[in-house]
Amino acid sequence: MSWQAYVDEHLMCEIEGHHLTSAAIVGHDGAVWAQSTAFPQFKTEEMTNIMKDFDEPGFLAPTGLFLGPTKYMVIQGEPGAVIRGKKGSGGITVKKTGQAMVVGIYDEPMTPGQCNMVVERLGDYLLNRA
């Protein structure tokens, strides 16, 4: 299965009538492996900072998580494995795998729990395949 198929079929799938706003699989180096059409343009340093938070949990807490034009307030995740952010009625979940990050961005009516489930399920699957 191609990386794009993982994004299209596993991340952008419908859950209880809702789906993510956008999603991507991004290498640890910040290179995009696959993304949905609406995934925001981002700076390499934004991905570098996300990777740094995986290595040093809490690194993003004082400044927030920036991805493209959006700043997310970092909320409780799983240190070294999952970063979660909130912005208004939406948010972001980033799951680290062996070589990549699975990123999902959502807005209402999708819930944070639904976003977490979609992103973390694919991330866990990829981790178990390695």
From Swiss-Prot:
Disulfide bridge positions per record: C13-C115
Entry-linked CDD domains: PROF (cd00148)
Membrane spanning residue stretches: none
Cellular component, GO annotation: cell cortex; cytoskeleton
Motif, Involved in PIP2 interaction: chain positions: 81-97
Keyword Disulfide bond: yes
Post-translational events: Phosphorylated by MAP kinases.
A GO biological-process term: nuclear migration
Keyword Phosphoprotein in record: yes
Coiled coil spans: none
Protein's cellular compartments: Cytoplasm, Cytoskeleton
A Pfam family of this chain: Profilin
Family recorded in the similarity comment: Belongs to the profilin family.
Function: Binds to actin and affects the structure of the cytoskeleton. At high concentrations, profilin prevents the polymerization of actin, whereas it enhances it at low concentrations.
Further facts: The variability of the residues taking part of IgE-binding epitopes might be responsible of the difference in cross-reactivity among olive pollen cultivars, and between distantly related pollen species, leading to a variable range of allergy reactions among atopic patients.
Oligomer and partners: Occurs in many kinds of cells as a complex with monomeric actin in a 1:1 ratio.
Protein name: Profilin-12
Gene source species: Zea mays
